[in-house]
Amino acid sequence: MAMVSGRRSTLNPDAPLFIPAAVRQVEDFSPEWWQLVTTSTWYPDYWISQQQQGADGFYDNGENENGGGHIDVADLLPESFDFDDMEDFFDTDAAEFDQGFDGRMYYQAPSEFGFGKNGEMVKKSSGNRSPRSIVEPAKYAEKPAKWGNQRVAAAPRNIHQPR
């Protein structure tokens, strides 16, 4: 509007964005907060900028208890590892199954190393209890030849039309 009338604008382009007090007082992760995040285009950016500026260190870049220094990962590791307790993390029943490329579960017998009688993978069927082969025969045979039913001696007939 200022350009149309020829007058200069008195608005400050460097002024901070006006945020209503009701929006500033919304509790984080409340239903009202979630509604603001999902419906407004500016509120997620505003909320993240407020969390970065906060004194709680939510997004403080490198500032922590040791005066802003880096955390030594070796201090976070335990003194020793007890490998006897690690067996609880591995499920022996789940080790019998292997996922294929299409996300299906394949039964892998220890003696077969994942292969069936003819060398193909064996898929565990969820419907019945017997494993079946991945490679299934085609439902339909190949398309028959176009001129397969004609006699050998007969040639294609030309249609003669008068001029």
Curated annotation (Swiss-Prot):
GO terms for cellular component: cytoplasm; cytosol; thylakoid membrane. GO terms for biological process: cellular response to hypoxia; nonphotochemical quenching; response to bacterium; response to high light intensity; response to water deprivation. It comes from the Eukaryota. It is found in: Cytoplasm. Induction: Strongly induced by abiotic stresses such as abscisic acid (ABA), salicylic acid (SA), wounding, high light, cold stress, oxidative stress, hypergravity and dehydration. Accumulates upon root colonization by the plant-growth-promoting rhizobacterium (PGPR) Paenibacillus polymyxa. Slightly reduced levels in response to UV-A illumination, salt stress and heat shock treatment. Expressed in cauline leaves, stems, rosette leaves, immature siliques and primary inflorescences. PANTHER family: OS05G0344200 PROTEIN, PROTEIN EARLY RESPONSIVE TO DEHYDRATION 15. This is Protein EARLY RESPONSIVE TO DEHYDRATION 15. The lineage of its organism: Eukaryota, Viridiplantae, Streptophyta, Embryophyta, Tracheophyta. The gene is ERD15.
